[in-house]
Swiss-Prot record:
Pfam families in UniProt: UPF0370
Higher taxonomy: Bacteria, Pseudomonadati, Pseudomonadota, Gammaproteobacteria, Enterobacterales
Claim: Cell membrane is one of the keywords in the record: yes
GO cellular-component term (any): plasma membrane
Annotated transmembrane regions: 4-24
Keyword Transmembrane helix (UniProt): yes
Residue span of region Disordered: 39-66
Lipid bilayer topology: Single-pass membrane protein
The protein, known as: UPF0370 protein YpfN
UniProt-annotated location(s): Cell membrane
Length: 66
């Protein structure tokens, strides 16, 4: 087990290379042209930030300084 304490980083590199090869292999299977041709429509983005727009913290130019 002394070799494992000395060379643990080689096992990590082998693992990362394996993960990288699997990612590349899976990405080659993706057909981006087919996906873009049949891309589903996204619904409009809804956020509720418009309520915050009424609460303006900036001072108005017409108001005199207090």
């Amino acid at each position: 087990m002394d070799w494992l304490a000395k060379y643990w980083w080689i096992l990590v590199i082998v693992f990362l290379v394996g993960v990288l090869l699997n990612v590349i292999k899976d990405l080659k299977r993706v057909d981006h042209k087919k996906f873009l041709a049949n891309k589903p429509e996204l619904p409009p983005h809804r956020d509720f930030n418009d309520k915050w727009d009424d609460d303006d913290d900036w001072p108005k130019k017409d108001q005199p300084k207090k």
